[in-house]
């Protein structure tokens, strides 16, 4: 499928699975009859034993929509303001835009607010790797990512260039891979993914730019009244449901539960990121720059990770332990200081010094790494019409590559939850959106993401310790589970 097909295709939810991508398949008739016989015999015997257990429905992928939850349509569904709540999405990053797309496909009314004045107003991060969220992209109507790159090999080196670990499809199969293997990670820049999602909405005009959230007030039976600052003036807007998708320093979260309850937690290291066009290397070549290899180099303290960023550039991520004060100071000194520190620490095997030197300071950023304590669902129970997704709900370190993946899964899960909980005749307006949708959604989201937050925090210690130097063809994260640090 070409990019144009992604843009022009309209989608609506699959009538077979109601947009879930899976169906409950009834147990076979023989199994049901057996249960009926067993339960009659049990009741007749009048014993104190354990009663027979009814066979549960078997959940299967929906074949009608290839498990995406969507089917092609001549047009998007008509917005259903009668049955669905109007959703105010705060934050136009990946999670917020993904939620807007999922609402569009379901006829759920929404408005997407972003504090930035434009799409390119500030850096939206560098590259990311779609892991389990690759399948979720189908559920957002994106069947292919034109700017996505597929890696087939992952290599870990010592600073001298000795390979201590290697894994991936190329390693396993020892054959030349297809251009788009079915089961592999997809590397893409954050802005490219964000743009692909925005194109589903029709482009930049789908976002209310320049809207800085100042506060909100939940009103009994009247939803939520939000206050924004727009071009220096105050603006009041009403919504039935507010979703904070505004990142690790979420204004919605701060207003909802306060900054002191679950403050930012420093994880003891700094990350420096850069993008290097291959043409800047002026003819220097390396087999590690073949566009399908991800590699990292470690020494037990510093660690650099490099992956394809585009067909003609690579992204690198350098990290090392540092006090919070030192990390803040270095970050505030700006790109040139970050580059100098990075170059000083990475006089290692080729092509690392060459790439570091060839990366323009304008393409470098760096920041201390934070997360937060796992969110207790009880902190949200009194928020009748407000919830959080993505980094606003469960921020994590970047070392497991799960932040964007979890945000995409959150967005799709919430839209599906609204479709189910606010369906016609559900009487959600009487029960409230929390009881009808949010409590179940938040429980699933926080349970799913908890291990990702925990593993991402533990990876900080693992990847910057001597245990990472142990040889073995496995991901570095697995060593944390199977070996003592």
Name each model-derived stretch.
Residues 2-11, 15, 22-34, 38-66, ...:
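C-terminal helical "tail/cap" subdomain of flavin- and related membrane-associated enzymes
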Residues 95, 118, 249:
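Conserved Rossmann-like nucleotide-cofactor binding loop
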Residues 162-163, 183-184, 188, 194-360:
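Conserved FAD-binding catalytic core of PHBH/FMO-like flavoproteins
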Residues 122-126, 328-331, 399-403:
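Short, solvent-exposed loop/turn segments at secondary-structure boundaries
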């Amino acid at each position: 499928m070409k990019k144009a097909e992604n843009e022009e295709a309209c989608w609506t939810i699959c009538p077979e699975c109601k947009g879930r991508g899976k169906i409950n398949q009834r147990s076979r008739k023989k199994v049901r009859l057996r249960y009926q016989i067993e339960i009659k015999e049990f009741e007749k015997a009048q014993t104190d034993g354990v009663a027979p257990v009814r066979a549960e429905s078997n959940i299967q992928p929906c074949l009608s929509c290839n498990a995406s939850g969507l089917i092609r349509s001549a047009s998007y569904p008509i917005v259903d303001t009668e049955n669905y709540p109007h959703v105010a999405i705060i934050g136009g990053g990946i999670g917020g835009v993904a939620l807007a797309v999922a609402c569009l496909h379901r006829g759920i009314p929404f408005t997407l607010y972003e504090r930035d004045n434009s799409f390119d107003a500030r850096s939206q991060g560098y590259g990311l790797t779609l892991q389990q969220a690759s399948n979720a992209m189908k559920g957002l109507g994106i069947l292919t990512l034109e700017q996505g790159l597929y890696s087939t090999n992952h290599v870990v080196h010592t600073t001298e260039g000795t390979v201590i670990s290697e894994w991936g499809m190329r390693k396993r199969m020892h054959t030349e891979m297809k251009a788009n293997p079915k089961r592999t990670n997809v590397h893409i820049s954050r802005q490219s993914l964000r743009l692909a999602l925005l194109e589903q909405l029709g482009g930049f005009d789908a976002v209310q730019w320049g809207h800085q959230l100042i506060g909100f007030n939940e009103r009994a039976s009247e939803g939520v009244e939000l206050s924004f600052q727009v071009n220096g003036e105050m603006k009041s807007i009403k919504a039935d449901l507010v979703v904070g998708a505004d990142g690790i320093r979420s204004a919605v979260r701060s207003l909802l539960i306060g900054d002191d309850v679950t403050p930012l937690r420093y994880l003891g290291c700094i990350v420096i990121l850069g993008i290097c066009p291959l043409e800047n290397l002026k003819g220097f070549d390396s087999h590690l720059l073949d566009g399908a290899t991800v590699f990292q180099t470690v020494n037990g303290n510093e660690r650099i990770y490099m992956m394809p960023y585009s067909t003609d550039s690579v992204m690198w991520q350098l990290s090392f332990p540092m006090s919070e004060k030192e990390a803040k100071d270095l970050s505030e000194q700006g790109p040139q200081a970050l580059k100098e520190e990075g170059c000083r620490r990475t006089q290692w095997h080729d092509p690392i010094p060459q790439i570091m030197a060839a990366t323009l300071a304008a393409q470098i950023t760096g920041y201390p790494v934070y997360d937060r304590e796992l969110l207790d669902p009880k902190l949200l129970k009194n928020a009748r019409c407000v919830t959080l997704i993505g980094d606003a709900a469960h921020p994590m370190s970047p070392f497991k590559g799960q932040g964007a993946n979890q945000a995409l899964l959150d967005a799709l899960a919430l839209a599906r939850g609204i479709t189910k909980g606010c369906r016609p005749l559900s009487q959600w307006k009487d029960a409230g959106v929390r009881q009808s949708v949010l409590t179940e959604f938040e429980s699933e989201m926080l349970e799913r993401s908890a291990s990702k937050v925990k593993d991402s925090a533990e990876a900080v210690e693992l990847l910057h310790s001597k245990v990472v130097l142990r040889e073995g063809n496995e991901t570095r994260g697995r060593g944390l589970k199977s070996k003592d640090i």
